[in-house]
Amino acid sequence: MAGGEDRGDGEPVSVVTVRVQYLEDTDPFACANFPEPRRAPTCSLDGALPLGAQIPAVHRLLGAPLKLEDCALQVSPSGYYLDTELSLEEQREMLEGFYEEISKGRKPTLILRTQLSVRVNAILEKLYSSSGPELRRSLFSLKQIFQEDKDLVPEFVHSEGLSCLIRVGAAADHNYQSYILRALGQLMLFVDGMLGVVAHSDTIQWLYTLCASLSRLVVKTALKLLLVFVEYSENNAPLFIRAVNSVASTTGAPPWANLVSILEEKNGADPELLVYTVTLINKTLAALPDQDSFYDVTDALEQQGMEALVQRHLGTAGTDVDLRTQLVLYENALKLEDGDIEEAPGAGGRRERRKPSSEEGKRSRRSLEGGGCPARAPEPGPTGPASPVGPTSSTGPALLTGPASSPVGPPSGLQASVNLFPTISVAPSADTSSERSIYKARFLENVAAAETEKQVALAQGRAETLAGAMPNEAGGHPDARQLWDSPETAPAARTPQSPAPCVLLRAQRSLAPEPKEPLIPASPKAEPIWELPTRAPRLSIGDLDFSDLGEDEDQDMLNVESVEAGKDIPAPSPPLPLLSGVPPPPPLPPPPPIKGPFPPPPPLPLAAPLPHSVPDSSALPTKRKTVKLFWRELKLAGGHGVSASRFGPCATLWASLDPVSVDTARLEHLFESRAKEVLPSKKAGEGRRTMTTVLDPKRSNAINIGLTTLPPVHVIKAALLNFDEFAVSKDGIEKLLTMMPTEEERQKIEEAQLANPDIPLGPAENFLMTLASIGGLAARLQLWAFKLDYDSMEREIAEPLFDLKVGMEQLVQNATFRCILATLLAVGNFLNGSQSSGFELSYLEKVSEVKDTVRRQSLLHHLCSLVLQTRPESSDLYSEIPALTRCAKVDFEQLTENLGQLERRSRAAEESLRSLAKHELAPALRARLTHFLDQCARRVAMLRIVHRRVCNRFHAFLLYLGYTPQAAREVRIMQFCHTLREFALEYRTCRERVLQQQQKQATYRERNKTRGRMITETEKFSGVAGEAPSNPSVPVAVSSGPGRGDADSHASMKSLLTSRPEDTTHNRRSRGMVQSSSPIMPTVGPSTASPEEPPGSSLPSDTSDEIMDLLVQSVTKSSPRALAARERKRSRGNRKSLRRTLKSGLGDDLVQALGLSKGPGLEV
């Protein structure tokens, strides 16, 4: 054993020492190999590392001739395949025997071998590509391969192995088909294989098709497998019928024709085949749940002469006893379902056929005529028809309470009040209700109706006013293109129904300076358009709604906290008025009155420790030294009476967290403080790479390069004069701003042109002179650039602010985030031995860095596990805070600068417009520009209000999270959002891994329920061992001796059926040893092989063949009691079998005329 292991108390071990061997199974059909080397060497495995990372070392140690990428580890002798993606500790639940060996001081053995999927693919490739003797040997070995590795069976089924067997068997002769049926029988003996056959309908169809084979051995084996399949579960009978009908529709033959041909004995007489066939039919009929399915099967058989076949075999003197029993059973089941007999022979009890009543017939006809579903009509019991009171009483309350229970709600919130009246009027009053309650309800209806009419009228009037005031603004402001296209001085373009000009004029006249603080520095050049209106409109920028930002958020709560904190410093204890709930006195200078719906956040968070952060016991017990969490503890002091905040019902987030109990003993063990390894210090990053800059580029080349992407010079001049944005794009305007001619360049070009008037100017010089000829060029370009940039600049500012506002709401309302904080706080309080009320969220960056000292798993991994245990319905957190994750990519300090730049550019655009007024400017163009700049000024002012209120809300949000005002001032929005984003991303990744691990464990538990389990261990076949026949047909290997009694025979039979044929995983044998190592047992029943069968078809049977024969024998020998007709569902009460309809449903004279009367030779 390596150091660090603990065998005494079963605690996790970090390093385990095992013995390792390899098994050369690259060729899955090579059955003569043994694990090598015979003396297994020892190897130390790290229990905390994934096994996939440790397999190369094991591979090198053993020198295994296997491909490294195809290797897997198998535990010996249990045969469990380890998951290479997980560590040993993560698979501890599935390795109880493995760790039990370690606890006893032993060294378990691991086998390095080929993965199951690789071996199965090799088997399928060999079967598909082989032919002749090689295919014959492969099919012969397939059964033994399934016997030796029980984990290979489900992998073979899941890898389309059944389809491979069917495809190979369809193109092979009967000898190959016999080998395939032997392998398929071995598969079906396992529960996993049987479930795979149940889910693969093609296998059942192929088995039914083989019933028509010319080889008796193939037919007999196929019938055996079908018998076991139908007997395994009652749900398999409909699957078998569906397969029969599918084959019949494909081949064009009648259903059940293959079984009827066996009963007709076209290929010779074989009593065993007849017994199996009739038993299969009886077992299928006995498992059918409804009468229609029963009659569909029997009618198809009767149409092919089943009655004549039954009578012929019953009339023969030498008919086998088992065959006679099954035939009589078929006849009695048919007669019992038709109601011709009242008691099943041998059933031991009387069973009356359910007679269809007249009420049931009427009800069925009514449902057929009315198009109703017959399944909803109550079926009568065995004693008589159902009472009609049930439907009447059940539909009565539904009709009364239906409209009231599911009203159709109106889309608008105002019209939702009308919903009250159907609830009042439709709700039925009780029989004992008085007349006074009726009058009271009517009075309430009248009052509510009057109030609703009043509100609807007011709403309609308000809606008309709003619709007339803002016809082109849907809850926000039009974009720059709409403002540009709708100038104020173009009244002819407006419709006479739109009073928007008057509303805008009144709004502009009502502009007044903000009483709190000016938005821009006071200057004599400031225009009135920068002043805010007294009654500000709804805060919305484009499609972003900021209307929930109230005027109370114009004041920064950090300033309020500072003033109130200063007042509280001299006092040794919180003042009594604050404890009684009275709000604190206003600070100096007095701020504007708070008008918002929520009170401001408290000046200082509550000081009382939270109950959920205290450990379970009142006094902390003495414990071992644990790893400490170096978080910054929140000092929640003060006893303010404010009990609610804008973000929740409590003053702080920590006060609203639910208590979380953690396993302190497990945490104490996992995070026990140990010698810390010296981690190498991180190397300092290299210095910044010096940037190479190119100075003094040639002006001419730069202009010529720019001209390649610009329109011709004359087009540029016309576009600049008319502000034609279709001729010059936004990129073109930016290039023109960099290519504007300077005064010095213009003078040099003019002097050169005067000196040489005959020589034309070059392209660059001509371009600069053309631009210089445009009056107010710089003003035009700046105004035009502002017009094109405004929408994008406004959205770049508004969208992050909106995301921040929504992100705070998402985080506060997120239940997963609260659970994470509560769990982490409880864990940290235990590890630190403290009673902290909370911690700064900046510690979330370090949660993934803390690791336990046992398994070296991060604290985040344990946190995910605890959260999933506490709240399995919790989310991954990352997908629920998308707004904050987007905010993590935005520099809000730069956003503030961009907002200031937008204001400055807006003022500069106004100055440019004033300077352009000196030049020639069309009146319509000037009106459009003036209208556009006025609207931009209003929107910039509104954007400034939104920015201020969102930032103040973020400060209040930090106070709600427990930050002090001093700490909140140091928090940057981008850094805060980045911390939450990175933590949420790591939490999602770790949570997915934990869920994947839990899913693998659950899959293992489900897989272990059927892993290697035989169908003889299921409830259906559990009585087979107790029904061992005490006749001379008992196998020789089962009987202990000629003088033994029934008790010994029963014990040996039970041990044979319940024992697995090959329980050892790695005890591989050569093919020459198969016959000698397996008990040779004769087949049950007649074993005389037909002369046309080849010598290789009579194969020696082993234990699995004997088990299959005993299962079939138990099915055929079952008593009539188990096959008594069951009470089936009836969709039509008067349906009879085809035989009874043809004979009993006609008149006596017509029956005699058709020659259908019963003769003496047809009596059963």
Curated annotation (Swiss-Prot):
Please tell me whether the keyword Cytoplasm is annotated for this protein.
Answer: yes
Q: GO cellular component terms?
A: bleb; cytoplasm; cytoskeleton; cytosol; intercalated disc; membrane; nucleoplasm; nucleus
Q: Where is the composition biased (Basic residues)?
A: 1127-1142
Annotated positions of the Phosphothreonine modification: 495, 690
Q: Where is the FH1 domain?
A: 487-615
The domain of life is Eukaryota
Q: Where is the composition biased (Pro residues)?
A: 571-608
Q: Where is this region: Interaction with ROCK1?
A: 612-807
Q: Which UniProt keywords apply?
A: Actin-binding, Cell projection, Coiled coil, Cytoplasm, Cytoskeleton, Phosphoprotein
Q: Where in the cell is it found?
A: Cytoplasm; Cytoplasm, Cytoskeleton; Cell projection, Bleb
Which intervals carry biased composition (Polar residues)?
A: 1073-1089
Biased composition (Basic and acidic residues) is annotated at 355-368
Q: Which residues carry this modification: Phosphoserine?
A: 367, 486, 498, 523, 573
Name the segments for region: Disordered. Answer: 340-411, 470-500, 566-619, 1020-1143
> Which regions are flagged for Low complexity bias?
402-411, 1028-1041
FH2 domain spans which residues? 616-1013
Where is each GBD/FH3 domain found? 53-458
UniProt comment concerning the protein's domains? The DAD domain regulates activation via by an autoinhibitory interaction with the GBD/FH3 domain. This autoinhibition is released upon competitive binding of an activated GTPase. The release of DAD allows the FH2 domain to then nucleate and elongate nonbranched actin filaments.
The family classification in the record reads: Belongs to the formin homology family.
Per UniProt, subunit arrangement is:
Self-associates via the FH2 domain. Binds to F-actin via its N-terminus. Binds to the cytoplasmic domain of CD21 via its C-terminus. Interacts with ROCK1 in a Src-dependent manner.
According to its UniProt entry, what is the function of this protein?
Answer: Required for the assembly of F-actin structures, such as stress fibers. Depends on the Rho-ROCK cascade for its activity. Contributes to the coordination of microtubules with actin fibers and plays a role in cell elongation. Acts synergistically with ROCK1 to promote SRC-dependent non-apoptotic plasma membrane blebbing.
Cited PANTHER family = FH1_FH2 DOMAIN-CONTAINING PROTEIN 1 (PTHR45920:SF2), FORMIN HOMOLOGY 2 DOMAIN CONTAINING, ISOFORM I (PTHR45920)
Provide the protein name.
FH1/FH2 domain-containing protein 1
Q: Which organism is it from?
A: Homo sapiens
Gene it is expressed from: FHOD1
